[in-house]
Amino acid sequence: MEPLELEGFLNLLKPPGMTSHDVVAKARRLLKEKRIGHLGTLDPDAAGVLPIAIGQATRLIELVAGVDKAYRTQLRLGAVTDSQDASGRIVKTGAVPALSRDDWEETLRPFRGQILQTPPMVSAVSVGGKRLYEYARQGIEVERSARPVSISRIEIVHYDPATPEEIVIDVECSAGTYIRTLCHDIGQRLGCGGHMGWLIRTRSGLFSLRDSLTLESLAEGPPKEQIVTPFEALAHLPALEIGENRLAALSRGLAQYLQGDGWSEGQWIRMHRRQKLLAVGQAIRKDEQWLCQPRKVFTRLETRSK
């Protein structure tokens, strides 16, 4: 494959058995582009949507990665593991209760909305300058603070009373939600313990499973028609169109006036010209006027892949 001039986002399908870093490394080789990063780690055993940023779009990862996610997962009841998933060692077992659909609705209700969740030991959260998974490898458990996360939807997809220990659920949640911890906490609520069996990420923001590309298809040829432009990838942000007479000022990093009062301090805004992203900025209040202060100004973005 010849070197490509691509900038934007690709929606890749991560297979189980590969790390997210492995997927990025392979994409770099296939696309012959060093500037590639992923938008949110998936565990090696997990599969599903793993969007990648290419070229200058890597500067936007933090703004695109912080969107809501959706997952399908298997909850296995009756066993607690030290990793909260099927790869861990079973540390406790319990009898699985027989539950009706109404019972399940009552069980899941407290997990909807904003909840507090304690990060698992096998996570990349830093405590005392070290990642939690580094402590876990040494057999050390450290105290962690609970964090607020939001779950907008949690529904049962499959439940068979003949095999009550295995339940498939769909979850839509905020970035930073640990599905393995959700499975563990549901098991704790039922009193029998539980852990995550398998996990598929079905959506990350506007990137969905049905539109994802396999690494095999990526190897077959240039995926230019599959590129999601930075302007499109930031669709969750308000847009400010820049007039022709303000382009020079924007290139020098000068603030642009905002219309109206429906802004909040620090709010991110995509700054564009005819839906070509020029910069991203933040709303600031100055002299009773709202302005958009550019934070990241781009050159050639969204033009090379055309």
Swiss-Prot record:
One of its GO terms (biological process) is mRNA pseudouridine synthesis. Belongs to the pseudouridine synthase TruB family. Type 1 subfamily. The keyword tRNA processing applies. Coiled coil: none annotated. InterPro entries: PsdUridine_synth_cat_dom_sf (IPR020103), PsdUridine_synth_N (IPR002501), tRNA_psdUridine_synth_TruB (IPR014780), TruB_C (IPR032819). One of its GO terms (molecular function) is RNA binding. The keyword Glycoprotein does not apply. The lineage of its organism: Bacteria, Bacillati, Bacillota, Clostridia, Eubacteriales. It holds the Pfam family TruB_C_2. This is tRNA pseudouridine synthase B. It comes from Heliobacterium modesticaldum (strain ATCC 51547 / Ice1). Responsible for synthesis of pseudouridine from uracil-55 in the psi GC loop of transfer RNAs.
